[in-house]
Amino acid sequence: MNTIHVDVVSAEESIFSGEARFVALPGESGELGIFPRHTPLITRIKPGSVRIEMADGSEEFVFVAGGILEVQPNCVTVLSDTAIRGADLDAEKAEKAKLEAEEALKNAKSEVDLARAQSELAVMAAQIAALRKFRQKR
């Protein structure tokens, strides 16, 4: 069976390393699907869920807050400042952070504050969506 090696790495630690049949993730220009022997590619990724289909058919989910994707024919590497295993996502914490980002957006006093709040809100909304997707698959 054809597989591709997948590494998902955050600034703090390696989140996932293993063999997979398929990887799906949110590219900057749309959803990307990576199979073994994919053409080499480097691109930015948006906040969202990385779905890793294992060789046995099971799935692993990882939330990433954006980052960089590198694809080689036999290897996929996802680099993200923040990456959280689907099983470790905390709905209460994510909702609280989303509310704080919405409040920061309302109270932004400069364009920098506004951009920072918008970015944080987008990340938290993507994390909540990833959490819902993970719960549906369980």
Swiss-Prot record:
Classification via InterPro entries: ATP_F1_dsu/esu_C_sf, ATP_synth_F1_dsu/esu, ATP_synth_F1_dsu/esu_N, ATP_synth_F1_esu_C, ATPsynth_dsu/esu_N
CDD domains: F1-ATPase_delta
Protein topology in the membrane: Peripheral membrane protein
Record has Ion transport as a keyword: yes
Subunit details: F-type ATPases have 2 components, CF(1) - the catalytic core - and CF(0) - the membrane proton channel. CF(1) has five subunits: alpha(3), beta(3), gamma(1), delta(1), epsilon(1). CF(0) has three main subunits: a, b and c.
Family named by the database record: Belongs to the ATPase epsilon chain family.
HAMAP family recorded: ATP_synth_epsil_bac
Name of the protein: ATP synthase epsilon chain
Species in which this protein is naturally found: Delftia acidovorans (strain DSM 14801 / SPH-1)
Gene expressing this chain: atpC
